[in-house]
Amino acid sequence: GRSGYQNLITFDMGGTSTDVCMVTEGKAQLTQEYSIDGLPIRIPLIDIHTIGAGGGSVIWVDDGGMLRIGPQSSGADPGPACYGRGGQLPTLTDAHLIRNTVRPEAFLGGRMEIFSDRSRAALQPVAERLGMSLEDAADSAIQLANANVVRAIQLISTERGFDPRDYVLVPFGGA
């Protein structure tokens, strides 16, 4: 491609999910094992692996007391609690705001006001259920999302015999 790189791992984190895909020697990896609503699709398609970890993915605790992220999403509207549009559920964006990895003054180039107090209020019940501080719960959610992304990249690379060190990561997306 125009970048001069032939081996890429694409990484698209949006509001609802993260998609990863490998491009080897300038060609996207293909699959013929795909289904939509349980119906098999038997034509060559670009092999995109999707996980439920986007900026709007909801952070929650399951019945066994384990921290989870997604697949439920707050969507763009109402969006994360920090948007101030009525969203009540804690999201990955809220966790990043609590941990200062998202700067309110720089969000959308400073064109959108976000509210850390709403993020904190939304994540507090999760922290209490886990018996953690708010900051530790936010850190744990971020670490879980990162681990899920790493696992997705492993599924498309090392588990298929490719070394991700031979590839350039190309991140893009809205989150």
Regions found by a protein language model. Name each.
Residues 1-175:
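N-terminally biased helix-coil "hinge/interface" segments that flank
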